A protein has these predicted regions:
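Fe(II)/2-oxoglutarate oxygenase catalytic core
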Residues: 2-606
Length: 606
């Protein structure tokens, strides 16, 4: 009796269902794909808008093959990828995996399927295929991007999870584009279908995302990658800038004592703030606004009269901004206060920036946004100079910025406060020509109580994790170890194209740089890069964990790029002096955030 044939020799030459090679299937595909006509049948769906996408159902020929592939994947090491753009788990490229069925699948894509794909799509391909497996758990996502990089020509996804539904999240969302070719809204969503292959040509408008997974007891499993081909000529027009609406200081005179906790406008306290800003480029001042005023503002923010407008483009940002003409009266006064020369003067005193015009050539200005945030909102890492010059509008970074860090809450001695109070009636922090009338002492304010709060805040911060994240660091190696850029580079170690998903966000860095060289570069940048001052006030954040949805200031090209974490805190005034190449990134808001929160963000320019 002859010996039984080895299992590897029993395998079919391909694991793909035969029906895709039939004349009828290929005629059907050709008629609808190339004529941009929609069709949906048992084994095929073609979507023509916003860009052409094909889904083939029952793609692998048997359930046994699918089970073998999934079993082999269980033994493949995954890594956790976390960045502003994405959060999920991923294997290395299958070119480096030698298990039986995964190797067969990879070889089939590299040979038979490449030939078939090139023939039916008329897209020129070579034999290079990038392939890996991804797994998305609860709160994982991959935000808006176009895959349009290098020699990628056709993107594909093979779905491995059974019984997936729309209520589980994780859909493949397709974006339409505006008149500038930038992503706008999700107009089509494909629910992951077990044993289906979805593919589309990588083009200038192939913007898509993996929506956040919201199932707590399921994982979204897939095999994905790209077919590669010759480089195409770049035909995309330059990416338009997002132009802020710059506002010059209004000659309105504001009585700050109506709004601000009094100690923060005492000259001695102002001087202390200035020292801290000069040293650390950052401050976080607690209980900055009067409690009753802050509470009324918080209520006003929930008014149905406010008109909110979503802002994009989706590959840069997704949140809502208030129409200032629709704000309730008190909130409108508060909003407009930040345009006033009074606030410009106060911020000049806090920072010594040239925010008050003293000559005709000086032109201080500001921009302001009242933002509403909820589940699904985000901003992404994007370099200003790259957006101005790049035809592709890639999210790559080219600038160096100086190290910045935080300010601990002010601690002022009792004696100094008494001295300040005695001199307060005759001395104003504002210049005589540009600011409101001098502010006088107010016996209604309990100075001792305010100072106790400040000291208590400092004490609590010194024993918290946030203090570690916000305190000044002596070297780059001591910056927050979970910074996005560090994670990306520690996880993405393969040479494979699949492993380079981080290339959407950054250029490779020379990791051999010594700390001294890095610090020298930062010092050089510090003397040459123009700066601006961010002012941040947050509302309705008490329902969130303090470190859950921080606003991060990131140097995109620095090895450990996160410089500052701004925690979510109500009634705090945050000041950050930043260089213009610094990116302000607000973390993606997951489905566990069930209420709105608000940011008033102003940026002041000398």
């Amino acid at each position: 009796m002859a010996e039984e044939e080895p299992q590897s020799k029993k395998l079919r030459p391909s694991v793909i269902s035969d029906f895709i090679y039939t004349d009828n299937f290929q005629r059907l595909f050709d008629e609808h794909w190339h004529n941009c006509k929609d069709v949906k049948l048992d084994n095929i769906e073609i979507i023509s808008k916003p860009f052409r996408v094909c889904r083939i159902s029952n793609f692998l020929y048997s359930e046994d093959v699918m089970d073998e592939i999934k079993n082999e994947l269980l033994d493949v090491k995954c890594r956790r990828n976390c960045l502003d753009l994405y959060q999920f788990e991923q294997t290395s490229d299958f070119v480096n995996i030698d298990s039986e069925y995964l190797r067969l699948l990879y070889q089939t894509f590299q040979t038979d399927l490449t030939v078939w794909m090139e023939r039916i799509t008329k897209v020129e391909l070579n034999k290079k295929v990038s392939m890996s497996s991804s797994c998305y758990y609860d709160t994982d996502y991959l935000l808006c991007h176009d895959d349009n990089m290098g020699d990628r020509r056709i993107a594909f996804v093979l779905y491995l999870s059974k019984n997936w539904s729309a209520s589980d999240g994780g859909a493949l969302d397709l974006f339409d584009t505006d008149e500038n070719g930038l992503p706008r809204n999700v107009v089509k969503s494909l629910i992951p279908e077990y044993n289906s292959l979805v593919f589309f040509e990588v083009t200038d408008n192939s913007y898509h995302q993996v929506a956040e997974v919201i199932a707590s007891d399921k994982s979204r499993w897939s095999i994905n990658g790209w077919f590669h081909g010759p480089l195409r000529e770049d035909t995309r027009p330059p990416r338009p800038e997002i132009e802020p609406n710059y506002i010059e200081p209004l000659n309105d005179r504001i009585n700050l004592r109506d709004w601000v906790t009094e100690c923060y406008i005492y000259p001695s306290i102002v001087k202390e703030v200035q020292k801290e800003i000069e040293r650390d480029s950052f401050t976080l001042l607690s209980n900055y606004f009067k409690d009753d005023v802050y509470e009324k503002l918080s209520i006003d923010l929930t008014s149905d009269s406010i008109v909110w407008k979503k802002v994009g483009p989706a590959d840069i940002r997704n949140y809502e901004v208030a129409d200032e003409t629709s704000l309730p009266e008190l909130l409108s006064k508060f909003y407009n206060m930040f345009k006033s020369v009074t606030i410009f003067q106060l911020l000049k005193d806090y920072t010594e920036l040239d925010l008050i015009s003293e000559t005709e050539t000086m032109n201080p200005k500001m921009a302001i946004e009242l933002q509403r945030w909820s589940s699904g909102c985000y901003t992404l890492l994007a370099d200003i100079n790259e957006r101005r010059s790049s035809n592709y509008g890639r999210l790559s970074q080219t600038e160096e910025i100086p190290e910045v860090s935080s300010l601990e809450v002010l601690e002022k001695s009792r004696e100094d406060q008494e001295k300040t109070s005695a001199n307060y009636e005759s001395k104003s922090i504002q210049s005589e020509s540009n600011t409101p009338e001098s502010m006088k002492g107010d016996n209604d304010i309990d100075e001792d109580e305010i100072l106790k709060k400040i000291l208590k805040e400092k004490s609590s911060n010194s024993n918290s994790n946030s203090k570690k994240k916000l305190s000044r660091q002596s070297s780059l190696s001591k910056l927050d170890s979970s910074s996005p850029q560090k994670l990306a580079r520690s996880l993405d170690t393969d040479d494979s194209d699949v492993s380079d998903i981080g290339d959407y966000l950054s250029d490779p860095l020379d990791n051999s740089l010594e700390n001294s060289d890095q610090e020298k570069d930062l010092d050089d940048a510090n003397t040459s890069d123009t700066g601006a001052l961010d002012v941040i006030i947050q509302f309705n954040t008490n329902h969130m964990a303090e470190e859950e949805y921080t606003i991060d200031y990131v140097n995109p090209k620095q090895l450990e790029g996160t410089l500052i974490h701004v925690p979510t805190k109500d009634n705090h005034l945050c000041l950050v002096y930043k260089t213009l190449s610094t990116c302000r990134v607000h973390k993606y808001v997951t489905h566990y955030c069930t209420d709105y929160f608000y940011n008033l963000i102003c940026t002041y320019y000398e």
